[in-house]
Amino acid sequence: MKRLLAFSFYDVGNSVFPMIVVSALTSSYFVNQVADNPQTGTALWQLTIGIAGILIALLMPYIGTLADSVKNGRLILLRLFTVICIASIALFWFILPSSNYIILALVIFLIGSMSYEASNGLYNASLKSCSTSNLTFGSGIGFGSGYLGGVIILVILLQTIILPERNLLNIPTEGQAHLRFVHIILALWFLIFSIPLLFLCKFNNTNSEPKTKVATKIKNLIWNKGLTNTGRFLFARMLYADGLVIVTTGIGIFGTSVIGLSIKEILLAAILANISGAIGCYLYGIFFKNDKKIILYNLLFLIVVVAGISISQTPLQFISLAIIGTFFSGPLQSSSRVVMANLTPDNTQGFGFGMFTLSGKITAFVGPILAGLLTFLISQRVGFGFSIVLLLLGFFLMIKVNYKDT
C-alpha cells in the first residue's frame, strides 16, 4: 500500500499541468496578458499543444525502449522528465505581461508539455510496480487522486491569490506578479507530491529487455498478418481518445458561447466535474474489475451524455450533464491504462506505454480540426456532437479486443 500511496500522490502533483497550466490559468494568462490579442494568443497556444503532442508521440516509443533497456531506466527517466516539467512551470514566473515574451513563453510551454507527456507515460508504466495485485483498484485510486488534487490546489489558489482583491500573501498585482507567482506554488506542489514515488519507491525494472530496433518492435506489437490484439486496442483507444479530446477541449467554449455561462459558472462546473470524476474512479476501482467492460459501458454512457450536452438548452442541463460525463470519462481513462499494462510484458512496460502515449497523441489534432470545420460550416452543436462518431468507432473496435483481467 505504501507504493500505491506514492503512486497516487504523484497523480495529485502532476495533475496541475493539464488542469491549470494547459487548460486554465496559464493559458488564460498567455492569451490575455502576453499575446498581442486573444485570437493570436489562442492560435499560438493551441499550435504549440499540437506540435508538442506530435513530437512526443513520435519520441515516446524510443524513450520507453530506453527506459526498458537500462537498469532502473524507468525510474531514472521519470525523475528526469518530472524535474524538467516542474522547472518549466516555475519558469513562467519570468514571463511578464508583454508581447516581448511570446516566444520565450511558448518555448517553455513546449518543453513543459513534452516533458509532462514523457513523465506521464513513464508514470503509467510504473502501475504494475506500484499497484496492488488488483490493477483496476490501483489505477482508479491514482486517477481519482489526480482529479481531487487538481480541484484542491485550484480552489486554494482561487480563494487566496487569484480572485481576492487583496490576496492572502500580499503579492502585488503590478505586472501580474500574483498570477506569475502562482506558478511557483504549482511547481512546489508538483515537487512535493512527486517525491514519494521518485525517491522512496523502487520499480521492478531490469535491463533484461532484448535489443531490437524500435521500428521492428512497433511492427511486431501492432501487426502480424493483420492487426494484433494489442494493435486493435491501441487503434480503438486512438479513436475514443480523439473523441475525448474534442469534448475536453471544446466543452468550456461550448458552455460560454452556446449556453451562455459566465467564467465563474465554468469554473464551478469544472470543480464539480472533477470531483465527480474522482468519485467515479474510486467507485469503479473498488467495485469493478473487468476493465474491458468498464471501457465499453462507459463509452456508451459518454455517447449518451455528449448527445445530451450537444442539444442542452439551459445552464442546469449543461452543468448536470458535464458532471455526469466526467463520472464516466475518469474510469474510462483509468481502465485504459490497466488494459495496456496487462497486454504488455513486464519487461517492456516502458515501450508499451510509449505506444500508449503515441496512440493518444499522434492523431489528436484530427478530431478538433474536423469538429472545427463542422462548427464553421454548420453549428457548434454539430461540431461538438461529432465526438460521438469517434467514440462509437472506438467502441466497435474495442469489442474485438480479446482481453482477460490478470
Language-model segments: which ranges?
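Helix-loop junctions at membrane interfaces in 12-TM secondary transporters
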Residues: 93-107, 310-321
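Juxtamembrane intracellular "pre-TM" segments in multi-pass secondary transporters
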Residues: 1-4, 202-235
